[in-house]
Amino acid sequence: MVLIDLINARGGHFSPNSWRVRMALAHKGLRCEVRDIGFMDVPTLHPQGEKVTIPTLVHGGRWVTDSWAIVRYLDEAFPDTPRLTGTGSETALLQFFQNWVQTTVHAGLARLIMQDLHRSLLSTDQAYFRESRERIYKATIEEIQAGREDRVAAFHKSLQPMRQSLQAQPFLGGAQPSYADYLAFGGFQWARISSPFAVLNQDDVVHAWFERCLDLYEGLGRRESASL
């Protein structure tokens, strides 16, 4: 089993969606080989030229792309391991939470770390990243991140749904971590690896939760060094 993942200039694995899969694999006690690539390698990855995204899992000749599809596949392919995505309404709720993470956590973090993220990338990836993100945001990389010190409080406020849950329990999944935790963890790990900017206050319960997540599975998250 091979996980295809992005690396930055320091060799760090920074993709938030890949971290969802990494934590899911650890939760299930599954091991895999990691194939490191840059953004510019993605178009030529598949031997038949099929479109893939990162992360992609290759298992038994099958290529599974997209983090949600990968975790669903792991639940099906390894039924004797702890299930992560549930069934029926549980799955629908997880998909709702994934959408919230994408539109609130990831979107908010992107505007706090964008220039730092660009600087951290492989030199061969920087031009592509700049052009694609500036086209999406209709602003320069520098403009996207500018004024973050004045905007970070609004980001903190947007995390109130997480904060309220974590005031009553150590993980979003309750006493033990669940895939909901890994969905949210990926974004904060993305920021930790890509930028020295403090996106959370140390006295925030969300910060304490993130530290607990970093310690899971023998410190899997901490093995990737933080940005300096």
Predicted segments, located by residue:
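GST-like fold's C-terminal all-alpha helical module
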Residues: 101-211
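Eukaryotic N-terminal low-complexity, Ser/Thr- and Lys/Arg-rich leader segments
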Residues: 227-228
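GST-like domain detector, emphasizing the conserved glutathione-binding G-site
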Residues: 1-128
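Intrinsically disordered or highly flexible coil/loop and linker segments, enriched in small
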Residues: 171, 219-223
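Structural alpha-beta junctions
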Residues: 29-31, 217-220
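Short, flexible loop segments at boundaries between secondary-structure elements
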Residues: 209-219
